[in-house]
Regions:
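A short, flexible loop at the N-terminus of ABC-type nucleotide-binding domains that lies
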Residues: 1-4, 8-21, 71
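Conserved ABC transporter NBD signature motif
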Residues: 58-69, 73-74
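Conserved ABC ATPase "signature" region
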Residues: 98, 102, 108-125
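Hydrophobic anchor residue at the start of the ABC signature
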Residues: 143
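Catalytic Walker B motif of ABC-type/P-loop ATPase nucleotide-binding domains
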Residues: 154-158
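ABC ATPase "signature
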Residues: 213-214
Length: 236
């Protein structure tokens, strides 16, 4: 279980907090959508969660492990894929996955890499340099790298951007399978229709604060998620 309590972050020289009193609970098996417009605080929350940003107040705990008190051990149990991941493009796909495995000090066999790559239909491209990959293929190799050490939590920032419909469908099926086995997924997206159909839980952030969170059906009520989202944003 991931628990975020009272998370507050203020950037240097800023007049106000970027995010304030963020409280979220993600349980094993959850596919948790995180939505809000540009500048609402999604990226700041995510960067605090994965240890890129420090924060002034609050706590982030994964199965009782604090990111502040045990940052290295915490990060070993999560993965993060940004919307435009930086990859070592001079490496082949196989070399990149082996590199990531070594960073996590994981003993991963060639068979493990090939089997995971097959789920993304990338097994025939593993020996090619990443610089020759399309955007969608680069997104796939980043996801394979994120999953190879079997994290408890994977954090995705706009994971479906640049993926063709087949690749997006395959990714959703893979995420469903992983979550059925107990992994947690937390992802931001501007595609509300995908979030509504795909996520069992949702949080909406506005002006750095969570304005609604919980089960998808509870957040949207009898309306569509788009209607519920717009209604919340029309309120001052």
């Amino acid at each position: 279980m991931l628990e975020i309590k009272g998370l507050t972050k203020k950037y240097k020289n800023a007049d106000k907090n970027a995010i304030e009193d963020i409280n979220l609970t993600i349980e094993n098996g959850d596919i948790y959508g995180f939505i809000g417009p540009n500048g609402a605080g999604k990226s700041t929350t995510i960067k605090c969660l994965v240890g890129i940003h420090s924060f002034e107040k609050g706590s982030i705990m994964l199965d009782g492990l604090s990111i502040k008190d045990n940052p290295i051990e915490f990060k070993h149990q999560i993965s993060y894929v940004p919307d435009n991941p930086d990859l070592y493009e001079f490496l082949t796909g196989m070399e990149y996955i082996n590199f990531v495995s070594n960073v996590y000090d994981e003993d991963v066999s060639k068979e493990d890499i090939i089997n995971l790559s097959k789920k993304f239909n990338l097994e025939n491209n593993l020996l090619e340099p990443i610089r020759t990959y399309s955007h969608g293929m680069k997104q796939k190799i980043a996801l394979i790298g994120a999953l190879i050490h079997k994290p408890k939590l994977i954090v995705l920032d706009e994971p479906f951007v640049g993926l063709d419909p087949k690749a997006a469908f395959d990714l959703k099926e893979i995420i469903k399978e992983l979550c059925q086995n107990g992994m947690m997924v937390f992802f931001s997206s501007h595609v509300l229709e995908v979030v509504e159909k795909f996520c069992n839980k949702i949080a909406i952030i506005k002006n750095g604060q969570i304005v609604s969170s919980g089960l998808t059906d509870d957040v949207k009520g009898d309306s569509s998620l788009e209607e519920a989202f717009l209604e919340l944003y029309d309120k001052e």
